[in-house]
Every structure is written in C-alpha cells, then in structure tokens.
C-alpha cells in the first residue's frame, strides 16, 4: 500500500516533472554533432496547486574555448482550469535574454491522467524573437516558430520514472531549421530516479534532427542533471 500511494503521488506530479516547494537544479549537456557543451543553473518554486516559476542561466563551451554565457530565462505557469481530477488546462510563458537579443514564448498545456502510472501532456507553443535575422530572401525578419510538444509520462516504480518527449517545430517566416527545411523534430528521453525527498538525479538522451550546415550529421545530445528540493 505504501508503494501504491507513492506511485499515485508521483503520477500527480510528473506531468510537470516537479515536486511542491523550492528547488535548485544543475545540468550539464554535450552535443555530439557540434562538440559543444552546456552548463545550466536553475532555481525554482512549485506551489501546491500546481503553479510554478523558475529562473534559468546557461553557459556554453567547446573543448578548447572558454565558458561563454548562453541565455537568462524566467518561466512561469498556472493551472487555470481543472474540470475533472484527471484533466488540467494550464497556460504558461517565458522571457529570455542572450547576447544577440531577447525573446519569449507563450504556451498552453493540456494534461490528462489516464492511470495512476501514466499521464500525457500536449503543449501548443509560440516562440518569438524580439530581434531580426536575415531570412532566405535576404530580408530582415523575426525567426519565430510554432511548436507542438508531447510529454508521455510513465511512473515505473515509486522511485523511477520515464518521459518520452517529441516536439515538432515549424518556422513561421522564411527561415530554415538546421536540417535545411522549414520544420524539424526534437525528441527527448528522460530517465529520473528519486533517491529521497531531496535528491532527484536524471539523464536525458536527445535527438535534435539532422544538421546540414555546418556539421552534416545527426545531432545527438546527452544531458545529465540533478534537482535538490528543500
């Protein structure tokens, strides 16, 4: 009965991959195509009713390069509508800043808990850059995109969980993605292990579609991180 209760608790929280309260997070990533690494530092707070906020800071590096600042970001979400104990509709948004300029995104999540051990979130998101880039026609425009994401959350045991996360991106204006087309996929497999009430380490195996310029190879990325809950 203790394990069943723990699984039910995890199921109610895995849709946002969070536990109530404040936390800090550290994550390191490595892209096998670009040979680029990334270090992420994050602080956040999750409220009991499901709302949350987090602040993120990243740095990138190559093997022989110095650490360079990536971006700063603040993100928040709120469970606006919950018609049943299984269905939740949750809007969210974020703003970010990096050396080339600022941007942001708004999204709407729809989560449904099918069983105590499986729930699915479908996300519709619009990504916007406040700065202009040169498009395929040589004109300056905003490289904005529309994104559809799915989060297939599985509770394997009271400590171990897995998320399958495919995302589809479509460039709204005349820009191509790294694969040479107006659209691309990013697929993430996340494995988490809950050590205790404080520590939650995880590993992510990601495929970021094929890059045709300048790497001419599949973009595979490995992320290793941990969260500490207070």
Curated annotation (Swiss-Prot):
<comment type="function">
    <text>Outer membrane channel protein that allows an efficient diffusion of low-molecular-weight solutes such as small sugars and tetraglycine. However, the specific substrate recognized by the OmpL channel is unknown.</text>
</comment>
<keyword id="KW-0762">Sugar transport</keyword>
<dbReference type="GO" id="GO:0015288">
    <property type="term" value="F:porin activity"/>
</dbReference>
<keyword id="KW-0998">Cell outer membrane</keyword>
<comment type="similarity">
    <text>Belongs to the oligogalacturonate-specific porin KdgM (TC 1.B.35) family. OmpL subfamily.</text>
</comment>
<dbReference type="GO" id="GO:0015772">
    <property type="term" value="P:oligosaccharide transport"/>
</dbReference>
<keyword id="KW-0732">Signal</keyword>
<dbReference type="InterPro" id="IPR009331">
    <property type="entry name" value="Oligogalacturonate-sp_porin"/>
</dbReference>
<protein>
    <recommendedName>
        <fullName>Porin OmpL</fullName>
    </recommendedName>
</protein>
<dbReference type="GO" id="GO:0046930">
    <property type="term" value="C:pore complex"/>
</dbReference>
<dbReference type="GO" id="GO:0006811">
    <property type="term" value="P:monoatomic ion transport"/>
</dbReference>
<keyword id="KW-0812">Transmembrane</keyword>
<keyword id="KW-1134">Transmembrane beta strand</keyword>
<dbReference type="Pfam" id="PF06178">
    <property type="entry name" value="KdgM"/>
</dbReference>
<keyword id="KW-0813">Transport</keyword>
<dbReference type="GO" id="GO:0009279">
    <property type="term" value="C:cell outer membrane"/>
</dbReference>
<keyword id="KW-0626">Porin</keyword>
<dbReference type="InterPro" id="IPR053713">
    <property type="entry name" value="Bact_OM_Channel_sf"/>
</dbReference>
<feature type="signal peptide">
    <location>
        <begin position="1"/>
        <end position="20"/>
    </location>
</feature>
<keyword id="KW-0406">Ion transport</keyword>
<keyword id="KW-0472">Membrane</keyword>
